[in-house]
Amino acid sequence: MSRVCDLTGKRAMVGNNVSHAMNKTKRKFSVNLVKKRFYLPEEDRWITLRVAASTIKTINKNGITAVLKKAQSEGFIK
């Protein structure tokens, strides 16, 4: 299973570790993914999603229904 957010499509980025002497080595910035259950009151059911912590903040701000609708329009969910 790839480490990708189900709703936003966020995935790992590539960057550099930079030492004090400015030596650079490649590294990967992973996404902070959390397996979380959300309640859909319209459908009266729970869904389990693997989402980034930043996406959970967005869901708390905008609501799960609005975020699901946006993810569907952007093609992240069917």
From Swiss-Prot:
GO terms for cellular component: ribonucleoprotein complex; ribosome. InterPro entries: Ribosomal_bL28, Ribosomal_bL28/bL31-like_sf, Ribosomal_bL28_bact-type, Ribosomal_bL28_sf. Keywords: Ribonucleoprotein, Ribosomal protein. GO terms for biological process: translation. Signal peptide: none annotated. GO terms for molecular function: structural constituent of ribosome. Belongs to the bacterial ribosomal protein bL28 family. This is Large ribosomal subunit protein bL28. It comes from Flavobacterium johnsoniae (strain ATCC 17061 / DSM 2064 / JCM 8514 / BCRC 14874 / CCUG 350202 / NBRC 14942 / NCIMB 11054 / UW101). The gene is rpmB.
